[in-house]
Every structure is written in structure tokens, then in C-alpha cells.
């Protein structure tokens, strides 16, 4: 907060507002995209198992991104079991993946071609 005030107090208020306002706007857009839009795809159906998705991120980079994303790639678990802490989503998903597949829950895997639907046979 101090550097922002210093920039504004030094007479660079237009530049400071533009810089910090732009950074704020980018932050809001990224947060909305990652925490509201992506996790609720495909946005076409409603129902307990259908209105949010699970996005599987493979490998070590996937485990790191899952933690950075605060396990929101398992957002469907949050909707199914809101009292489960976010850091337990992946373990719970592993336990109920077959049930979710049987109920038609959307599960995607990140690939070089983007998000690809995961077949019911390979969901677990």
C-alpha cells in the first residue's frame, strides 16, 4: 500500500492510477475466469452432478498448478460436499470418481489440445 501512496503523492497520480487500476482489473478478470467461469463449464445442464466440472491436471506440473489454483480444478467436489476442506478434494475425487462418472459428471483432462472430456472408463 505504501508504494502506491508514494507514487500518487510524488505527483504521478495519473500514471499510478492507470498502472494500479490496470493491475487490479487484470487480477479481477483472471480470478473470475479461473474461479467462476472455467470451473462451471460446460454451462449447459443443471443438476447435482452436472453443473460443475472436474479438471484433471496430469503430472508434477499438474500437482503444482492444483495447489496454486487452491484445488478449484476439483470444484465439483465443492458443490457435492461443501463442508469438505479444499485440500481434501483430490483424495475425495479419487474415492468417488466411478460414482461421478456413472452420474454423468463432466470430467476433463488438460492436454496439449486443451480440455478434453474424460471417458467414463478412464475416470478413476
Where are these regions (language model features)?
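Non-catalytic, topology-defining segments of multipass membrane proteins
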Residues: 1-22, 83-124
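Hydrophobic transmembrane alpha-helical segments that form the core helix bundle
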Residues: 1-66
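A structural signal for well-ordered alpha-helical segments within the folded catalytic domains
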Residues: 28, 71, 87-90
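Histidine-centered catalytic micro-motifs
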Residues: 36-41, 68-84
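Residues that form generic nucleotide/phosphate-binding pockets
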Residues: 37, 67, 95, 99
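Alpha-helical membrane-embedding segments
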Residues: 52-65, 78-92
Amino acid at each position: 500500500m505504501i508504494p502506491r501512496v508514494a507514487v500518487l503523492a510524488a505527483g504521478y497520480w495519473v500514471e499510478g492510477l492507470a498502472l494500479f487500476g490496470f493491475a487490479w482489473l487484470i487480477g479481477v478478470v483472471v480470478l473470475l475466469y479461473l474461479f467462476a467461469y472455467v470451473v462451471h463449464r460446460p454451462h449447459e445442464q443443471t443438476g447435482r452432478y452436472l453443473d460443475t466440472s472436474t479438471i484433471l491436471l496430469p503430472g508434477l506440473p499438474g500437482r503444482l498448478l492444483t495447489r496454486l489454483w487452491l484445488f478449484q480444478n476439483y470444484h465439483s467436489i465443492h458443490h457435492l460436499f461443501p463442508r469438505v476442506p479444499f485440500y481434501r478434494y483430490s483424495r475425495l475425487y479419487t474415492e468417488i470418481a466411478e460414482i461421478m462418472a456413472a452420474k454423468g459428471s463432466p470430467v476433463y483432462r488438460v492436454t496439449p489440445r486443451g480440455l478434453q472430456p474424460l471417458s467414463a472408463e478412464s475416470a478413476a
